[in-house]
Regions:
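Sec-dependent N-terminal signal peptides
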Residues: 6-10
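Small beta-barrel nucleic-acid-binding modules, primarily SNase/OB-fold domains
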Residues: 3-5, 15-159
Length: 159
């Protein structure tokens, strides 16, 4: 019993969060949702920022807004289940989320709407490779990676 109690204390002190939450989701942006008030950051992916623009065939489009709205459409009125094992520095649960039997994180990357966030996970690299090869979503044109966009990098002007 003493050994079990010690292990439990060590586990709790380690900061590991194991969560399985389900419910209606509110979409904050392309890779962040909230379920029952808990903010959830989709694991292993990064999407364009809400105000980010991309270019396809010389036409600039609001890719960040479009990705957010696409995710909202996928999740709207659906039961979303998220499985997470840790929180980020903003207190968001880092999780893989599922709706209608598919992995939302994987689908965003496969459709070319998100990038595999290699800095934190290698999980969705195969989906990104397929999206890039098929020139789906972001891969059909020009874009700045979300992590570079956050650092101030922008597309070169298209003259």
């Amino acid at each position: 019993m003493k050994h079990t109690y010690t292990l439990l204390c060590l586990f709790l002190l380690s900061g590991v969060v194991v969560a399985d939450i389900s419910g209606a989701a509110l979409t904050s942006d392309g890779d962040t949702i909230a379920i029952s008030g808990m903010k959830v950051r989709l694991n292993g992916i990064d999407t364009p920022e809400r105000n980010q623009t991309c270019r396809n065939a010389g036409v600039t489009w609001k890719c960040g807004y479009e990705v957010t709205e696409t995710l909202r459409g996928w999740l709207d009125t659906k039961e979303v289940r998220c499985l997470g094992d840790r929180k980020d520095r903003y207190g968001r649960l880092i999780a893989d989320c599922f709706v209608d039997g598919y992995n939302v994180n994987a689908r965003l990357v496969y459709e070319g709407l998100a990038l595999a966030y290699r800095k934190y996970s290698k999980k969705y690299i195969p989906e990104e490779d397929k999206a890039r090869a098929a020139k789906r979503g972001l891969w059909a044109g020009e874009f700045v990676t979300p992590w570079d966009w956050r650092r101030g990098k922008r597309l070169e002007p298209d003259y």
